[in-house]
């Protein structure tokens, strides 16, 4: 059959674009779909149903395939049938066979539903959506094995009443609230063949109940007004919107269709189960329903008292890991009390799941062991990032390149004295000067010491007893003193607990320096002898801990430390073993301040320069010549203040900068220190709201000499340039000059 190049135009084909609704055929006619072109499907393909009809004159009720075949036989071109005729006949367009089916639906877990129904089933609704329990599960039978079905469910209001739970029963409380938007849940496996549906239990466990009206999940379909089941617009999604304190009835539907978009024009078979009726609540009202949920729902662990939730399981795993770590370290390091006491405290900060709870107690380890008050997300994140959380919570820090987890050599063990300072003797304002703290033992670049010499003297016998004391007395707030370790060899770390830097009970688990910023670059610590005065006061290890580098202040040699200490009139050993308040004096005499609050430099260098200039006259006074004979005389001059009060500065804020050339000229071998001080004008803010009961980090010039009034007059009399020069030359001053400067 040959077709002409130009197809003739048949009058009446334009009628195909006008809406025309014929009488409904027994199966279903799709002419309305082709004529209306609904908004949800602007380019609807020809339907697979064989009952679809085009709006050609005289062929309104003919199936589309019959029209195409008849047109080919009569010689009518395909283009004359309208634009839809150009569409290729797909397999889904073929008419389905007429199948007789009789679906039957059986509710799963009917006995459990009956138990809930007798007591009045309650379902919790939340903003984010809550799944149903018992879940809605059915088993289907009687379906055609080859035909495709769509299975879905919706929840409708059982009545027009609002309820309240009163006197252990539900009673009507008024008229129902306005109905929520209609929402249906289509099973995610739809469409599927009848054989697939009948081979398994159909569960709607992913359906969620919510009271969030603004929920936008899903899509919307428009149902015709003459639909047997639904009319109007319905949205399809995973969440159904309900009103609290209203009674609802779930419904189950079976639709024989192979496309979800055909739902508005398909026949629904609806099934109701009265035992699935429930009342939507925001919190369980009936205790019997709550108990039923606990007894039957394996996920209802928020109400349990037996401790089967995730938090309880984490605690059990933590206790189990404690025993495993104890046994492992006993095998590696022997069964002696000494090795076990060393390992117990190291494991406390080695891993988040280590014997932290059994060693120190949960009162001081809230950052390491998840408590009941924590949320699951926080506890899980701490478990997932165990090493990072461990390192951030460490109070004992090192500058070694070697990992802190190396458990092989006992010399690399960082010991935490958890209960070294009980509360009765831990107050700084009540203890005597000689019994307040043991001298701080700080070792810097001590390569010649052996493992036994580097061990702290307090470690041998007191740690187990103190740990037991802290465990037996949970009311006591144990302090966690700072342990500063440095060594340039990065192989064996010296041990030096610094009790004067102990944190308060609330800060026991926090990081070194308590989060205060320190605007010092590690490159400023890389110059040898730059901070020799700090090393003289025992500050070399502290700066090395701040820099975090293995080549920083730990590179300070012994000669620089010894020479600076000799200039102060102290030996190298006494400079490192001074009590903490005397170390503050030595630091302040060099223009530096060491704050017990956790910050190193709590005010700018200009303030420190002024303080050092004022105290340079007393740098070699009798206080420094006899450091241990004047303890009682010096103690009343120490100021107790929770705030950092800056030392008064003479006029001219650029005091250090203007005098820099003269300082560089007169510095000589000390120009490295001057340049380092001038090049890094750091200003660190101290937490003024801190409740630490310790002395202020600011030491005025009057606390450096025996006569504060004379020193104040001396400071006012001297000029700024002379003060700076005296700072530089004070270390090399002769004894007779220092005697004339002191009263």
Curated annotation (Swiss-Prot):
Effect the entry attributes to changing residue 143 to P: In UMS; reduces binding to T site 5'-TTCACACCTAGGTGTGAA-3' DNA sequence
GO molecular-function terms, A-Z: DNA-binding transcription activator activity, RNA polymerase II-specific; DNA-binding transcription factor activity, RNA polymerase II-specific; DNA-binding transcription repressor activity, RNA polymerase II-specific; RNA polymerase II cis-regulatory region sequence-specific DNA binding; RNA polymerase II-specific DNA-binding transcription factor binding; sequence-specific DNA binding; sequence-specific double-stranded DNA binding
Residues recorded as bearing Phosphoserine in the entry: 371, 432, 438, 456, 707, 738, 740, 742
Region (Disordered): 301-342, 358-465, 688-707
GO biological process: animal organ morphogenesis; anterior/posterior axis specification, embryo; atrioventricular bundle cell differentiation; atrioventricular canal development; atrioventricular canal morphogenesis; blood vessel development; branching involved in mammary gland duct morphogenesis; cardiac epithelial to mesenchymal transition
Biased segments, Polar residues type: 438-447
Record field: compositional bias (Basic and acidic residues): 324-334, 379-388, 418-437
DNA-binding region location: 107-220, 241-305
Alphabetized CDD domains for the sequence: T-box_TBX2_3-like (cd20188)
GO cellular component: chromatin; cilium; nucleoplasm; nucleus
One Pfam family here: T-box
Keyword Nucleus tagged: yes
Tissue distribution: Widely expressed.
Chain spans, region Transcription repression: 544-695
Subcellular locations according to the entry: Nucleus
Superkingdom as given in the UniProt entry: Eukaryota
Keywords tagged on the record: Developmental protein, Disease variant, DNA-binding, Nucleus, Phosphoprotein, Repressor, Transcription, Transcription regulation
Keyword DNA damage among UniProt keywords: no
Function: Transcriptional repressor involved in developmental processes. Binds to the palindromic T site 5'-TTCACACCTAGGTGTGAA-3' DNA sequence, or a half-site, which are present in the regulatory region of several genes. Probably plays a role in limb pattern formation. Required for mammary placode induction, and maintenance of the mammary buds during development. Involved in branching morphogenesis in both developing lungs and adult mammary glands, via negative modulation of target genes; acting redundantly with TBX2.
Summary of subunit composition and partner proteins: Interacts with PML (isoform PML-4).
Disease field: Ulnar-mammary syndrome: Characterized by ulnar ray defects, obesity, hypogenitalism, delayed puberty, hypoplasia of nipples and apocrine glands.
Protein name: T-box transcription factor TBX3
Organism: Homo sapiens
